[in-house]
Regions:
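Short, flexible active-site loop motifs that bind/organize anionic cofactors or intermediates
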Residues: 1, 51, 72
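N-terminal first-folded block
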Residues: 3-45
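Basic, gly/Ser/Thr/Pro-rich low-complexity segments located predominantly at protein N termini
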Residues: 31, 58-60, 84
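A short, internal acetyl-CoA/4′-phosphopantetheine-binding micro-motif in the GNAT/acyltransferase core
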Residues: 45-52
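Conserved acetyl-CoA-binding loop-helix of GNAT-fold acetyltransferases
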Residues: 53-64
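C-terminal structural segments of small proteins and small subunits
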Residues: 63-97
């Protein structure tokens, strides 16, 4: 079981750079997006290979989707990882643009 509490503490929203960034054990991951017309378009998720399988990408997607929900945004998942995540999590379907 992954410790997502630790993960949540390492994710930082950088709105000026339009991304969320995670740092864990000196390694990084990020999710990049653009905004327009009430839609957050998630373009890309990238995680350092040293972090693969540790829940970092999922944590980044959750953070981005939670932000979209709080801000009243819909989500267009151009990123294949985000699209797959949303398909597997029905609680996110209402966010689809």
């Amino acid at each position: 079981m992954r410790d997502t509490r630790r993960m949540a503490k390492t994710i930082e929203h950088q709105p000026e750079r339009r991304r969320f960034e995670a740092t864990l054990d000196g390694h990084h991951g990020r999710i990049e997006y653009r905004l327009g017309d009430g839609v957050m378009t998630i373009e890309h998720t990238e995680v350092d290979p040293a972090l693969e399988g540790r829940g970092v990408a999922g944590g980044l997607v959750r953070a981005a989707l939670e932000h979209a929900r709080r801000e009243g945004l819909k989500v267009d998942a151009e990123c294949s990882y985000t699209r797959s995540y949303m398909e597997r999590h029905p609680e996110t379907h209402d966010l689809r643009a």
